[in-house]
Regions:
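Sec-exported extracytoplasmic/periplasmic mature domains
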Residues: 45, 49, 80-88, 95, ...
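Bacterial signal peptide processing site
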Residues: 17-19
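Acidic helix-start/capping segments at beta-turn-to-alpha-helix junctions
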Residues: 55-76, 89-113
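...with weaker cross-activation on analogous glycine-rich loops/strands in unrelated enzymes
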Residues: 36-41, 99-181
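Second-shell loop/turn segments in exported
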Residues: 26-34, 61-70, 114-118, 139-142, ...
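C-terminal motif of bacterial Sec signal peptides marking the signal peptidase cleavage site
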Residues: 12-15
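Low-complexity, Gly/Ser/Thr/Pro-rich intrinsically disordered linker/tail segments
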Residues: 176-208
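Sec-dependent signal peptide recognition
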Residues: 2-7
Length: 208
């Protein structure tokens, strides 16, 4: 009887320890995700520059880690430059995924694409949307501002024809209801209260 009592206590002790370790691992994982999202917000805020010239022209750029001229850019360059601050090269990641899964990506008629192009593929909003859905997490679209968290990605369709993209930051609007967005819609890389200024068509999270 004494033997079984000792064995029972050992089993209970081991079970409690396992639960404790699992809880610690879970907390550590959540903290890592939160830390990344905050870092992405900080990275986006760090590249704010209203003097950036909005230029959608095609540029031949290095690969990997290529970028258009520093004084130029469009909305997608905000995303690319922010992630690159964290050591993540979306040019390379998107190119590699497109090479392996070209048919999964949109091939809009105006692009006339028959193969991948690392100069421009990652700078197109529809390609970013597909990549974030494939490799990250597609989130619900909502009219509730609290649904859009720090470090998440939002895409819009402006006037029914212009795809747009931005990063949700940890900064709040004056009324405290909405997170501010870093984006570039023609006024440079800026931080604005614009979450619901355009039609939201995509909501994503991509953490590493």
């Amino acid at each position: 009887m004494k033997y079984f009592s000792i064995l029972f206590l050992l089993i209970i002790s081991y079970s409690c320890q396992q639960k404790k370790e699992s809880k610690i691992i879970s907390l550590t994982s959540n903290q890592a995700i939160k830390k990344f999202e905050e870092k992405l917000s900080d990275a986006a805020i760090s590249i704010i520059d209203p003097t950036i010239e909005y230029d959608p022209a095609y540029f031949s750029i290095p690969y990997p880690n290529g970028d258009v001229p520093k004084n130029k850019g469009v909305c997608t360059d905000v995303i690319i430059r922010s992630y690159r601050k964290l050591g993540i090269d979306l040019q390379k990641e998107i190119h590699e995924d497109m090479v392996a899964n070209f048919s999964a990506y949109p091939n809009l008629e105006k692009w006339g694409m028959t193969k991948t192009d690392p100069n421009i593929d990652h700078r197109r909003v529809p390609n970013l949307e597909v990549f974030f859905e494939r490799k990250g997490q597609k989130l619900a679209i909502s009219q509730d501002p609290s649904a859009y968290k720090t470090g998440e990605i939002v895409t819009w369709m402006i006037n029914g024809k212009l795809p747009h993209i931005g990063i949700v930051t940890n900064k709040k609007s004056k009324d405290g209801k909405r997170n501010l967005i870093v984006h570039n819609v023609g006024r440079g890389q800026v931080l604005e209260d614009c979450l619901f200024d355009y039609e939201i068509v995509g909501h994503y999270k991509y953490v590493k």
